[in-house]
Amino acid sequence: MQKYYDVMIIEFSVKNYRSIRDLQTISFKATGLKSPAGSEIDSNNIVKSDGVSLLKTVGLYGANASGKSNMLMALSYFAHAVRTLAIDSRGVRPLYDPFLFETSNEGCFFQIVLLLNGKKYRYGFVVNKSDNVPGKNSSNDVKIESEWLYGNVDKNMKRLFLRVGNEVKENNLPTSEGMIIPTKLPYPHTLFLVHAAAFDAKGIPEQIVSYLKYRIIGNIVYKEIFRGVSINIIKTCWRN
């Protein structure tokens, strides 16, 4: 399991999902805005790591039906998909819910940017309906249309893998000594990130999967856990 200070989320982006048609991003980057003089908000809510200033908490504001809840739903299901076994498409299926008036057959886009051990990583994928759907609610009714991972290598952003359809076109993942990650994917809905993590317990994919698995608790998928964690945090803050 990753320590809290080892991994931090920088931003999360969504496109063509439920009420969200155009690309929308939740950013945890601190801006140059300052709180009133004497306020402790900045010092208590901003954490700095490797020269990057990030917010511990953010708020979403907007009109009714503007997509606030759907952004959180997307993040919750995104993390849930990474937690799910490669054989099961149920983790990916809730992420295929394109904008109602989208007629181009474009897939649903999701991407997260993380700071992992001082290095920035950008991971994402596009979910679309399967080309051959045997029946309603079939386990094969969705597929990963594309998937990618970029990371800082020698201070430059490098593509670590690229998957198009069910084929891994490029694999530059650094692995532990003696580890070989097969690029053949068992199912169209299998995430290569999860697939790679299963073969290298110390690699970058496993570290990303661990963060999404243990550190992002969505109030959509895990309502009771989210409620319990929230109550404990409030109680702790109240005592202090």
Positions of the model-derived regions?
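Short acidic/polar mixed-charge low-complexity motifs
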Residues: I20-D22, N117-Y121, K155-M157
